[in-house]
């Protein structure tokens, strides 16, 4: 891995809010024990709020948004993951408090990650997003004899 990579960085100085794709250094990623090469991310409603003006969800600037991402483990200090593991990250306030997935690389706590099911690709995982992944996890764990009701609410 090169020490420099691209990330969408938001910043707020006084009343001035900015978004910019920047070349940053690996040392910029200050949280976590697992480094992931991000393959895909999503644009969630919460991401849109954060990208507009921080939405009072982001407390420290500069910041990398992106609440969901899927990718491949590059480095790990955790016993839970090893180099080459394909992972999914959703929730845990990543993209709000912790740096998120709008970056070529992300560094997060191992507890925030799950191994990607082999039945789906990283792209498919991010096409589903947080709500879809929750539903699919339920479907994978439901017994064949059980009925599962999936509801969807779309706000336009």
Regions found by a protein language model. Give the residues of each.
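Short structural boundary motif marking the start of a folded domain
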Residues: 3-8, 34
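Short gly/ser/thr-rich secondary-structure transition/capping motifs
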Residues: 15-21, 54-55
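Conserved hydrophobic/aromatic beta-strand scaffold that supports enzyme active sites
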Residues: 19-21, 26, 70-72, 105-107, ...
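Glycine-rich beta-strand-centered segment in the early N-terminal region that forms part
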Residues: 25-43, 54-94, 120
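Cytochrome P450 core scaffold surrounding the K-helix E-X-X-R motif
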Residues: 46-51
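NAD(P)H dinucleotide-binding glycine-rich loop of Rossmann-like/cofactor-binding domains
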Residues: 90-150
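Conserved small/polar residues in nucleotide/adenosyl-binding loops
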Residues: 154-156
């Amino acid at each position: 891995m090169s020490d420099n990579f691209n990330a969408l960085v938001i910043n707020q100085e006084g009343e001035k809010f900015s978004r910019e794709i920047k070349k940053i250094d690996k040392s910029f990623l200050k949280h976590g024990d697992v480094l992931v090469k991000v393959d895909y991310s999503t644009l969630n409603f919460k991401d849109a709020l954060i990208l507009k003006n921080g939405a009072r969800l982001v407390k420290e600037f500069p910041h990398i948004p992106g609440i969901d991402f899927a990718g491949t483990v590059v480095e790990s200090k955790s016993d839970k993951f090893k180099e080459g593991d394909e992972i999914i990250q959703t929730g845990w306030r990543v993209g709000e408090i912790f740096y998120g997935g709008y970056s070529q690389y992300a560094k997060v706590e191992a507890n925030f990650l799950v191994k990607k099911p082999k039945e789906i690709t990283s792209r498919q995982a991010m096409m589903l997003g947080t709500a879809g992944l929750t539903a699919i996890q339920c479907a994978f764990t439901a017994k064949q004899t059980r009925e599962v009701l999936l509801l969807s609410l779309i706000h336009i």
